[in-house]
Amino acid sequence: MKRTSNWIAASIVVATCAVTLTATGSINADDTATTPTSEVASSEAGDDSASTPAAQPCPSTSAPVATEAPASSNDVGDGTVEAVEPLEIAVLSPDYAAQPAAKEAIDFFEAAAEAHGHTVTVVDTNSDNAAMNAEITTAVSQGVDAIVVAFGTPQEFGDGLADAVEADIPVFGLDTGGLAEGILVNVTTDNGFLGEQSAQAIIDEIGEGGTVAMIHFDPFEPVRLRAEAARALFEGNGIEVVEYIQGDPEDSTGFAAAAVGDLLAKYPAGELDAIWAGWDASALGAYQATLAADRTEILVTGVDGQAFAIAEVATGGNWIATVRQDWDTIATTELGLIEAYFAGEEPAETIVYVPAVVITAENACT
């Protein structure tokens, strides 16, 4: 069951391999759309001659289905967790509707948990981190067995987390923006790796020297860590970061498209080599802007490995890489930790990292 913080049911659909874009560059969440983003970007700009080929879906375009979680996954404990009674689990997030990656991870978790007989309620506070406190308190008052805080900035959830601790209700982090008192464990990806590998894809293409613009978001710790790692690698290779732009997660694609459009006017051909974006929804806006301006000499990279990103990377155009976070494994690992806890096994670590994969045109459809 899903609801927004005011109990209005959310209905959000994300395309599985190609998405369409609105005129402002935001994602049009229509899973029936088949028009590739590069085609749409070109036609919106009144230019059908963009040099990047239209994205073609990879051979399988069906939506991903969560694999059933083992009783204990990713070497959680000794791997012999006994079956637990069905649980009531509240999944609370400020980012379910706003971020495709959050939706994918939460949907995987919900599917895996329900396959194990648990009841899951998903609550979206619509980009409002502060509202998470009230939602955690509400979940506590409803007597749920466990709470999952997914994405968001848990340092802002202090009051709600305190209520959960007082009620002895365990709270688990699903790719949250770091740890906070009251969260037993956070299952995530090594964000330093994500930043370095997405930056390395650019370095491999342009070599030492050159110029890059970066779209980051410091308030969310995972993206901040990615950006710090990427910037350090760029600067270590003599690449100048000429623009360091704070993105907008509430309108990731539209904001990035507008910001990069301005950059392209500021930096004529030959003065900007690449754009690094800390998450795919922003990379999509940057990519769209380069297509619309016929500036496909500028490389783009993203992070998350969303289906729309992989579809574009597969074309061999100027969106050259994304780094795929394994949301399925992140979700099933989270479930394994929850079930282990209720079988009497405390998490051995406060952070569990799940490996990520660099996606380029060579492996995008494999």
Which residues does each predicted region cover?
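A residue-level marker of the well-folded mature domains of exported/periplasmic proteins
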Residues: 2-13, 21-366
